[in-house]
Amino acid sequence: MNQRFLQITTLLFALFSLSKSSAQSVTALKTEYLVNPIGLDSTNPRFTWQMDDASQGAKQSTYRILVDTDSASLIKANAKLWNTGWVKSDQNLIVYSGQLLKPFTKYFWRVDIADGNNKKSNKANIASFETGMMKMENWQGSWISDTENTKLKPAPYFRNTFNANKKIKSARAYIAAAGLYELSINGKKIGNHRMDPMYTRFDRRTLYVTYDVTDAIKQGKNAIGVLLGNGWYNHQSTAVWYFDRAPWRNRPTFCLDVRLTYEDGTTETIKSGKGWKTALSPIIFNSIYTAEHYDARLEKTDWNTPNFDDKGWKDVMFRSAPSKNIVAQALHPIRDVEEIASKSIRKFNDTTYLFDLGKNISGVSKITVNGPAGTVIKLKHGERLYPNGHVDISNIDAHYRPTDNTDPFQTDILILNGKGKQSFMPHFNYKGFQYVEVTSSGPIQLQKEDLVGYFMHSDVPVVGEVKSSQPIINKIYYATNNSYLSNLFGYPTDCPQREKNGWTGDAQIAIETGLYGFDGITIYEKWLADHRDEQQPNGVLPSIIPTDGWGYEWGNGPDWTSTIAIIPWNVYLFYGDQKLLADCYPNIRKYVNHIDETYPTGLTTWGLGDWIPVKSKSPVELTSTCYYYADVVILAKAAKILGKNDDYLKYTALAKKIKDAFNAKYLNKEKGIYNTGIQTEMSVPLYWKIVPEESVALVAKNLAKRVEADGFHLDVGLLGTKAILNALSENGYSDVAYKVAAQKTYPSWGWWMENGATTLYENWPIDAKSDISMNHIMFGEIGAWLYKSPGGIKPDEKQPGFKHIILDPHIMEGLDNFEASHIGPYGKISSAWKRTNNGIRYDITIPANSTASINLPVNSGASISVNGKITSSNKIDLAAGKYVIEQKVGK
């Protein structure tokens, strides 16, 4: 089909059903990727929206943004701070460039759009955002703590009272902490966040959180309470990463401003400092790594209420700020996202019970129990059981180095006060577990309903969905998402129990899985800021981020710390937003330059290699050089995007040098085999596109043969799992990839599912003796592959952010139907197909203001129709709208 015919066909598809056009509106208004956020520090926040128009071919032609402090003015289309006027553009990501924003101010913004027929959106669409401190000098409160040292175990309470003598219009609490905190006013906890603030390199960047506390404060006398936890700041548990020796370590501290705005327009700030009192709480020990201990006999009832008698409390100690960079926590918070009832209970005797949640999670348990004062309840959390039915934690405590027996791993301790039923749930800890073994120092009676679990993680919106006709695929997808979320706590982790570390290798493997399934840009922007904090002057990054200093000498290298390039690049592809790529550009360049200077031949042996392979080991130089090449290619592309032409030329040449050196050493061109031809050695070069174009077909063919010879089972480690399915699918062997993905016998993802897994594991054998966490995300690329291959949904590098969508669904033997959807920046993309009596039916949805190109499988003699209209090409351009495409095989 010639290009002219394609254009005509596309136009026809765009015009089809215009008579059925629907009302046009603007939805999903966000500021900095959050809905009506408060406490932003950005002087130039980003505005995003979506066009809601089901008409075929719907497209935004112009937009207008209005910003003001008065929402009523915006309804009348008046704006004092910023009025862009009608801008001819189809973009929906715009950076604010109006008048200078002021701190502590609520702003409203409105966006109006028009389509190609100048039909304007049908109502005023108004959102808001509110600035926070914006500058360090705007803080009025002092950093305070108690007078204890880092070795003291109980967590401290802090309190103060104040009078609000006028009618309050609004009130905001701004709280920064090194450690963790819970804020309360007049006896009630503020907000539903958990584990605030997020973990950072405390001596380089500390986060603060803003709360709307208008409804919590009453006219008259009020009380503020703060409970501090250790978090990663005062790590008292000892393990192989030496967080107990962190350079920032100190007793937890906080700074608080509560800003009151009265109805008469005046303001008042209640601040931390002189007059505050402190005492020890009933939390007699808390470790984010191990557990929490609580002595209910020490409870101070109503300690955070106005009339509490605090005469016995001590004065606070003033402290210096933990860093010179106190910035807003502008990201999706950690929450108790799902309450999970116990699936079963087993009673061993009157002092020992086992609860099973039915699935492996990250989070906490909550127990409700009654017993005599002084009764000690221990709640041991684990992922698996011994044959006798008791909880086995030997797979997750391998790196723990306790100095005594007072802090058992993943074991909460509750001491009862004898005052009837009481409930306990940790404040400053989370664990990875499915089972909870409850033991008591004396007889107790428990029912199944007495213990529930809470699945805790960063509460990122779900934006993806996968469904298939094959149950094993559905189980794998479910388990992959469980592991992804179990390892998202303001930064991506490897596992929620044994380590809780921000391992870079695991995160670069899972980045696409995360972005297809969840709206995670705010988490990754925060974590890449952690990268920038941790990078050494020579460009080296540690293998875990954040870190106390561990990881600069082991575990890092391009196969792990390529996160500095791979994650910003993927965020750019998925969101069409250059900011993270631009913010990290100097760091990527510094990193690449370090490798270039250290390994001038273009080949590097720096890295861990294909971690935890099934059986075959690939040379570290082979895999690390592929990642080095990927970093340089990303750097060159970023240079071009950001207008740095000299860098573009420089790093394009460096990429060629690496590619030539790599293929000269490892590629047998005649045979089409890399090194010895095992799965990782063949798939990693294909995936990262370092294979010479003329050799791709033969290398892919040999990879498919290798996989078939391996019985369609995996023979890869961490790096190979990122590549294997994609390398096959992208090069004509999607059926082979599917046989691997849907495999149910060892070694495979399905093997885990067949043995009861609800998450992904760290090792292929379920009876491995080491490296056997049962909730790891490092083999999680299969989640992204389901979107890319059977789903066929891919971003277009030339029009990122799914402005243009590449649809390339692969019809695979063994699947009768498949559905994938992803809510991108422009709306919901749907790609579904099913087998019919005479072919394949595709149901496609392209969101308004975007376009797509679909590549259908070549099938000689088949007829293709789009919404009932026959076309002669298997490559079809689509405007926005819904399509039924039928590919029928002639008799």
What are these regions (language model features)?
Residues 25-498, 505-506, 522-525, 542-549, ...:
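Extracellular/oxidizing-compartment recognition motifs
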Residues 149-153, 190, 198-202, 212-214, ...:
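Alpha-helix capping and helix-loop boundary segments enriched in small/acidic/polar residues
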